[in-house]
């Protein structure tokens, strides 16, 4: 039986590659990301390439805590069980040495790379623990 894999930051790069790898293994994927156009493009592409797997898409900005809760709830209502969570969303801003980083860039990276992913984990974890995942 195919597993259901939720992937944050799935619209490009590593997230897209992870989604493709799970689909190649016969798993179903839930693609999340900020770029709605990319989510729809990937859904169409993956549906054509992997017709036996299911691909769901949900727009998600992990820095928006209300959106995280809403989307998590929507995903759990749509999909019977989440087997795997790949918290891939992240970003890197600026190329300056650390001491020269802009404070806003650091805060944005913390909001995305730490707080956002913690919020996503916290949202899905109870259902995954209940299902022994």
Which residue stretches match the model-derived regions?
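Active-site loop of short-chain dehydrogenase/reductase
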Residues: 3, 81-82, 129-133
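Conserved glycine-rich cofactor-binding loop
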Residues: 11-13
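A short, exposed helix-loop element centered on a Lys and neighboring polar residues
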Residues: 121-122
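Conserved glycine-rich Rossmann-like NAD(P)H-binding loop of the short-chain dehydrogenase/reductase
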Residues: 25-41
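Substrate-binding pocket helix/loop in short-chain dehydrogenase/reductase
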Residues: 96-98, 102-110
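The beta1-alpha1 cofactor-binding region of Rossmann-like NAD(H)/NADP(H)-dependent oxidoreductases
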Residues: 60-70, 103
């Amino acid at each position: 039986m195919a597993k259901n894999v939720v992937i944050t930051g799935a619209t490009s790069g590593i997230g897209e590659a992870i989604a493709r790898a799970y689909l190649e293994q016969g798993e179903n994927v839930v693609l999340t990301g900020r770029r709605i156009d990319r989510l729809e493009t990937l859904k169409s592409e993956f549906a054509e390439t992997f017709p036996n797997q299911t691909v769901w898409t949900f727009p998600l900005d992990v820095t928006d805590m209300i959106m995280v809760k809403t989307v998590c709830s929507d995903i759990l209502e749509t999909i019977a069980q989440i087997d795997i969570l790949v918290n891939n969303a992240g970003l890197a801003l600026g190329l300056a040495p650390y001491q020269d980083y802009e404070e806003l860039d650091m805060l944005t990276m913390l909001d995305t790379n730490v707080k956002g992913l913690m919020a996503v984990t916290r949202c899905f974890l109870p259902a995954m623990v209940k299902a022994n995942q």
